[in-house]
């Protein structure tokens, strides 16, 4: 009886452990993009950007090597148009966002 309880308990533990795992860098990067970029940019592989002049994030690798964006993100992104806020990301945010952008290539 005790063995059955322990066996079922261990099986249950193994089943719920993935759900409790910490988010991956890609997941955190997507969450960052959703919170900070999606108002204007398409952040997935297929949709159009809500703001027509804002390039979809999935096309950034066509313009720049993704790794080359690291310095720009660290120094702060600023643009010539007033609608886009200036961004300066910390190293963890940069890693997460670049990890997510690589999934869109």
Residue map of PLM features:
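Disulfide-bonded cysteine motifs in exported proteins
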Residues: 4, 32-35
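Bacterial N-terminal signal peptides that target proteins for export
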Residues: 1-12
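Electrostatic cytochrome c docking/interface patches
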Residues: 17-32
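His/Cys-centered metal/cofactor-coordination and adjacent catalytic loops
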Residues: 22, 47-60
């Amino acid at each position: 009886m005790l063995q059955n309880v322990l066996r079922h308990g261990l099986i249950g533990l193994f089943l719920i452990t993935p759900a409790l795992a910490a988010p991956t860098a890609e997941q955190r990067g997507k969450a960052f993009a959703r919170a900070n970029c999606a108002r204007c940019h398409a952040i997935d592989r297929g949709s159009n950007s809500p703001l027509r002049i804002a390039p979809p994030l999935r096309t950034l690798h066509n313009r720049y090597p993704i790794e080359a964006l690291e310095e720009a993100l660290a120094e702060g992104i600023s643009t010539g148009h007033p609608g886009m806020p200036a961004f300066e990301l910390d190293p963890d945010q940069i890693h997460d966002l670049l990890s997510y952008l690589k999934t869109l290539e």
